[in-house]
Amino acid sequence: MEQPSILVKILHSIPHVNYTFRRVNDTFNPDSDVYLEPTNNKLQCQQKGIELQSLVILASIPAGLLIGSLLGLLLYLLTRCCDRRQRKPSAQRCQSCSLVIITLMTCAAIGLGLYGNDDFHNGLLQAFGSGKSVEGLVLTLKRQTESIKHDLETRMAGHKVEQLVEKPHYNQTVVMLLIETSRLVTENTSRAVASLDSMVHYFMKAKGSENDTSLMGLLQLGEFYESIRWPATLAFLTVLLLLCTVLVIGVARRSRCTLIFFSVSGLFCIIICWLLAGVYLASSVAAGDFCMRPHDYMCRQVGMRSPYVDFLNCGTPRNRFILRLNESRDLVDRARESVEHMQRMSQETYPHIDIQRTLNAMDNDLEITLRNLTTLSATLDRRTIDMHYEEALRGLCGGGLLGLSLMMVAGLLTSFLLTILVYADSHAWIYLTKRPTLDADKSETAPLFPASNAPSASISPTAPLSTGTINRTLLHHQQASSGGGSGTLPGSGGGAGAGGGVGANGHNGVGPYRNGSAGLRQGLASPSSQSSHTSSTATYNNGTTSYHNSHQQHNNHLYSNHYSHSNNHYNNTQHRTNPAAGAVAAAVGVVSSGQRSPSPPPVYDLVHGTRSGHHTLGRLPSHHQQSATYLPGPNNGKYATLSKQCKTLESNDFY
């Protein structure tokens, strides 16, 4: 037998202690029934029970680490869950890099577990294959033994030599000798059949107890558990790899939901990993104890009348099957010698046609039986069983133990690294700030003026004070009013001389500006002082009155009255403007003493439809809501907008 490997020695050297931390016997003895049986040998029972306790204590070490890690995570979450202080970007980047590096290390540990799982599976399959070979050999021996027994019993009983010998004859001495020899042949044949029957009896029973199972039953049970364990372990390790992938994606996208999902899922995976690590640790130590002295454990099964280890050299003088087989063969040889002796005696006493034919048939049958027993003896050679036994040990204590040890190491590493990942991930999503979207339009939310010089006056006619946003629809209206083709407002007559005309080329009037901001600048600001602001307002009132009279004459529509009402409201608003509004207007407007202000924008409620409780996205209300305000022309009287929402302008739009 080969010497134990270094791995077997390392696993066997792990201390076996009881709950008092005293070293105990490390001999492999996994029979739990023996542990629970009350025996007279109290010391032996205590040693066996303590050995089982040592394996349980080894398995409880990862369980203790699991409890400690869960308590630490609970304390961390209780102390840090309400801490919302903003962390520096450099600290967040370092944390993300650490998460990715630890995740890669965890994936490597999981890969080691996958490799060990495959090695352990292949080793068990090799051991199961060798066990099936031994089982097949035993079944073959059983069938051959039954066949030899049946043939010997039936053929020898069918010859009926005694009836031929008992016929009346003048030489009674020869007759008595022939009858005695015939009975000796029958007796030897019966004893040979009894020996073969005892072999069949041992083949039929694996152990003496009725609760014991055969080797084939153990192999089938082991294959059933392995068919569940191998794919389940493979699926669990694959799930761990997927969770690591989810964590990397969550760190890359800075997704709080993904990181929280990993924290919750990783918590359950930590529990399973630590428990599996405990099972692998105890199993590896037990396998190391078995592989250290496997022959001793197998030979102990001889006392339990296990026929499968009876072929091994366990210190017994000879194999019991070989003994029974040799006994049967010797008895058949004696029966054959008796038949030959009967043939010699019957040649002179009985006619050849009467008894010689029967004796020759008996001799042929005994010769065939002897030949079959010789073949069976070669099959029972211990070298064949030893070959399968060595293959089974090589698969179990070689690749199988290596795979189990790798799974133990991978389980411990994965549990430890996964615990760190859950800690770091919980720290990440607690302090993680939501990253702004890349496609967000800053111009939609940026203020009109910076906070340092924001005006206190409202841009929109009906907007509250101290707001710095303006509707893009109002800009379109003012641009259309100020950028017309005529130099004076319609119906103003000599407005050019009184109020300062607006030239077509924009030299003295309002020309086209970038982003349509000319009307806005002149519609919001007065030239220089409060007096000029008052005069400009008066001029604006005269111009707008003339404009609306002319507009009423051409269109005859209800909208002109509403528009005049909005202009008057806008003029009153301009009269109530505080001095701060004048400062803002001076900063934004165009400084000219004789310029005419453009037409004021429509009422804010009319444009946005806020009176009816609906947001019309910068357009006039529909004609079915207010038929009187319906206007003919393009777009049904609605103002075209560049976006569906209000556009907040920046300072770059004006300068």
Curated annotation (Swiss-Prot):
Knockout consequences: Death during development.
Residues recorded as bearing Phosphoserine in the entry: 597, 599
Glycosylation sites: 18, 25, 171, 188, 211, 326, 372
Compositional bias ranges of the Polar residues kind: 465-480
Low complexity: compositionally biased ranges: 450-464, 526-539, 546-576
Similarity comment text for this entry: Belongs to the tweety family.
Chain's role: Probable large-conductance Ca(2+)-activated chloride channel. Modulator of embryonic movement.
Protein name: Protein movement modulator
UniProt organism field: Drosophila melanogaster (Fruit fly)
Lineage, broadest ranks: Eukaryota, Metazoa, Ecdysozoa, Arthropoda, Hexapoda
Name of the gene: Motor
